[in-house]
Amino acid sequence: MRILVAIEPVDGRKGIDSLVQLCREKLSADPFSGCLFFFRSRRATSLRVLAYDGQGFWLAQKRLSKGRFVWWPSGSEPARTLEAYQAQLLLAAGNPDTLAAPLWRRVDAPAS
């Protein structure tokens, strides 16, 4: 599966239709290709993932409870391709280049 990360941050209020248009116009990519598209908010506190599954679009968002996404690709191209393990690190607010992610507070199971 191809994973594209948009270099430029996007307005966090954008919905599926706006992100599909952004994929076409800014990233020169087909949003119906089955590719995962990653977008970061301007404040770097949330990350959105857009995907098409053959029937419709999925839009998922992760908002950090604390801190910011410190790593994000840069460059002259509109997007960067990531491998699956790099995307997993990115979702954990880590750095795919150094293969490191920050430690977060532990979530205990609810008492029964």
Spell out what each predicted region is.
Residues 1-112:
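Polybasic/polar functional segments that serve as interface/processing modules
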